[in-house]
């Protein structure tokens, strides 16, 4: 007859209960593929809620829960094909931060003139149609003019835009001027985009630029997001970019890589799917070095009038394919 196990002492029972409730389950616990202790979800949630003063949040809850924000000295790459919404994703993140926190932001934009960037940020923040705003200003509409002027003196006084192609030394000088202007250190910086930084545009040059920006963000002690063009061999426009999609690389330097793409470019879509995806945009966490290394692909509504990116509502789906034309 097999020998029965000895009863546990009260001390042994307490020790086992403490071990089971601990977030550190030791080396003897299997490495599960599909489950993890619920305590990790609460840990992630608490960190997400409490890190307002630490890490910069992008304002997309699913992405923020995966990345848990961007800390000082960390670099994020936002990768995708041209005109696929990469910059727009970060513009929305900037506006969310300006509206909901006391964030001060430095934007390096050698790709677009600062006037155009300012217009896009205003339309996102105030839900304005870009064409209508331009027409109001042309017509001398006082309400529209006052809205723009008031926003520039208040909300948008916490963002500074430089549209030159600056060296790393010049970027540091710009940072010092921003610190002097605000009397404080900025919370976040954006570069749009990597390939337009001074230097060679071949593989060696692009990697050197990525390494230089990473080094700059650490020395400047600032969270940095960098727009990075997808290479020609990175796949179809309507599919998520892989981790190596960035033109000539550079992804090794980043804490995380976000792939931005639009399913509207898929030639196999049905008519109904074309209508739906004519206003959709996908943000994919392609790589994430922050434990527990969560990834994911998240779909949002991209307003064709204001440039706002947010979750879908029922009335967001167009009745026809007007935005595909």
Regions found by a protein language model. Name each.
Residues 6, 11-22, 32-39, 127, ...:
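C-terminal regions of RecA-like/P-loop NTPase motor modules
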Residues 93, 116-121, 174, 212, ...:
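Alpha-helical scaffold elements adjacent to nucleotide-binding pockets in ATP/GTP-utilizing enzyme cores
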Residues 65, 101-185, 297-299:
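Cytosolic-facing regulatory segments adjacent to core modules
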Residues 19, 23-128:
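The Walker A/P-loop phosphate-binding site
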Residues 68-70, 99-101, 151-154, 180-183, ...:
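Conserved catalytic network of the ASCE P-loop NTPase/AAA+ motor domain
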Residues 107, 190-191, 222-229:
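Structural recognition of the conserved hydrophobic beta-strand(s) that form the central parallel beta-sheet
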Residues 84-86, 113-117, 168, 196-200, ...:
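Flexible loop/turn segments at secondary-structure boundaries
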Residues 158-219:
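Phosphate-binding/switch loop-helix module in NTP-utilizing enzymes
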């Amino acid at each position: 007859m097999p020998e029965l196990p000895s009863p546990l002492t009260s001390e042994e029972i307490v020790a086992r209960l403490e071990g089971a409730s601990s977030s550190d389950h030791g080396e003897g616990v299997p490495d599960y593929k599909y489950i993890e202790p619920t305590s990790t979800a609460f840990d992630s949630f608490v960190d997400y809620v409490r890190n307002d003063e630490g890490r910069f949040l992008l304002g997309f809850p699913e992405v923020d829960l995966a990345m848990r924000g961007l800390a000082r000295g960390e670099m994020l790459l936002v990768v995708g094909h041209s005109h696929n919404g990469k910059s727009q994703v970060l513009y929305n993140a900037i506006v969310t931060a300006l509206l909901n926190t006391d964030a001060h932001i430095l934007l390096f934009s050698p790709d677009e003139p600062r006037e155009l960037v300012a217009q896009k940020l205003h339309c996102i923040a105030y839900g304005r149609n870009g064409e209508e705003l331009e027409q109001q200003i042309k017509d001398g509409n006082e309400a529209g003019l006052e809205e723009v002027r008031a926003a520039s003196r208040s909300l948008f006084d916490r963002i500074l835009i430089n549209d030159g192609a600056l060296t790393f030394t010049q970027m540091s000088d710009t940072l010092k001027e921003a610190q002097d202007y605000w009397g404080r250190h900025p919370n976040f910086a954006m570069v749009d985009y990597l390939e337009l930084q001074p230097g060679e545009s071949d593989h060696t040059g692009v990697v050197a630029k990525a390494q230089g920006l990473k080094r700059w963000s650490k020395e400047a002690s600032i969270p940095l997001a960098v727009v990075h063009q997808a290479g020609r061999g990175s796949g179809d426009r309507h599919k998520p970019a892989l981790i190596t999609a960035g033109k000539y690389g550079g992804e090794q330097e980043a804490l995380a890589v976000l792939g931005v793409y639009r399913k509207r470019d898929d030639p196999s879509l049905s008519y109904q799917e074309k209508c739906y995806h004519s206003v959709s945009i996908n943000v994919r966490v392609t790589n994430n070095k922050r434990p527990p290394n969560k990834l994911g692909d998240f779909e949002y509504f991209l307003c064709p009038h204001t440039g706002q990116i947010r979750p879908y509502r029922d009335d967001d789906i167009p009745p026809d394919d007007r935005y595909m034309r």
